[in-house]
A protein has these predicted regions:
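Bacterial N-terminal signal peptides
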Residues: 7-16
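Membrane-embedded alpha-helical bundles that constitute the cytochrome b-like, heme-associated redox core
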Residues: 2-5, 20-360
Length: 360
């Protein structure tokens, strides 16, 4: 009796289990077959391969928002990036200027195509300032070398008398050498930062070159303010004797006697030195100083945005290249290019014969 009851109970349980499993499978199949309810604005198809190739021909395709584009081309976020690239300002908790702008708006700097400002700055630097600046400096160096090869150091025509005349005071020489040392520091460090990857990086390797450029960049930033202060001192010290005079035109017309071999009368500074003072020291010097102080963020009250820094860098680099080209000639004439010139700035005195021949 008990055995028959147990067999009957097991049969009932087995039938119930089979019925439950059959119902669950049926419900699962029905659920998978039922169409999914798509929320408004959501992606209707995740398979980008199923997108028709003519989706861009739909009316209003170009004006679609990112949500609308996701319906016809899942994964195509062009509308969002188009807004970002147009200079759209988003939200950021950072207090810095332009923190909400991921990409700058399109501009067209001289020498660059119309594109985002960051890319336009890169184009100007890499395709204009670097190659043309290098060509300018190379041309000047080659011209100086050829001139020295043909002319050598310009000698005195008469014998020295031994009588010395003061040409520069101690203060004038101190101002000059302070400015000159700061300028050379800036020029060398600037040239390495601009061109070093072309001729130093392959030799030194990435690690040593990176360490060197870091040191030179630090030296550049510290020498900049020193150059700015000493430049103002130099301008105020020598401006009086660099004012234009009547004999300057005659000096320029005869090329300073550089090719004829005959000296041309001039005041304390000849027309060539005055051109260097007004063009190289005053105009280019102040441009380099102003843009450099802005790049170092040392000018109070300014909003240091990316566009401001980009324009300042381009102006700074271009003016510095021109300034270095001019001062290469000045350094040459003040050292090996003319007999007695370096001694004048080192000791402050020149021989009487030198004074008569060069500055009557």
């Amino acid at each position: 009796m008990k055995k028959s009851f147990a067999v009957a109970l097991m049969s009932v349980l087995l039938c119930a289990s089979v019925w439950a499993q059959t119902k669950a499978v049926g419900a699962s199949v029905a659920a998978s077959a039922a169409p999914a309810v798509v929320a408004p604005g959501s992606i209707q198809d995740q398979n980008i391969l199923s997108v028709k190739p003519d989706a861009d021909l739909e009316p209003g395709y170009a004006a679609q928002s990112n949500g609308e584009r996701a319906k016809v081309q899942p994964g195509n976020n062009a509308p969002m990036w188009r807004q970002v690239g147009s200079g759209l300002t988003g939200y950021s908790s950072l207090p810095t200027p332009e923190a909400g702008n991921l990409i700058q708006a399109a501009v067209q700097y001289p020498g660059a195509t119309k594109t985002t400002a960051g890319e336009a700055w890169r184009q100007v630097r890499n395709s204009r300032i670097i190659p043309y600046g290098a060509a300018l400096l190379l041309i000047v160096v080659v011209a100086i070398a050829l001139f020295y090869w043909r002319k050598g150091s310009l000698p005195l025509h008469g014998a020295e008398t031994g009588r010395r005349i003061e040409r520069f005071t101690a203060f004038e020489r101190s101002a000059h050498w302070t400015n000159a040392i700061a300028f050379c520091t800036l020029a060398i460090s600037g040239l390495v930062m601009a061109f070093g990857k072309f001729f130093l990086l392959p030799v030194l390797g990435a690690t040593l070159f990176g360490f060197l450029t870091y040191l030179l960049k630090t030296a550049h930033n510290f020498a900049g303010p020193l150059f700015a202060v000493s430049l103002v001192v130099v301008i105020l010290t020598f401006v009086k004797d660099n004012l234009p005079r009547g004999e300057d035109l005659a000096w320029l017309a005869r090329g300073g006697g550089l090719f004829s071999g005959k000296e041309v009368a001039s005041h304390r500074f000849n027309a060539g030195e005055k051109l260097l003072f007004w063009g190289g020291v005053f105009v280019l010097g102040l441009i380099v100083v102003g843009s450099g102080l802005l790049l170092d963020k040392l000018l109070p009250g300014l909003l240091y945005e990316r566009a401001t820094m980009q324009v300042s860098h381009m102006v700074h680099a271009a003016a510095a290249m021109l300034m270095m080209a001019m001062f290469l000639g000045h350094i040459y004439m003040g050292t090996i290019g003319m007999q007695g010139a370096y001694k004048a700035m080192r000791t402050g005195y020149v021989d009487e014969t030198w004074a008569k021949e060069h500055h009557e």
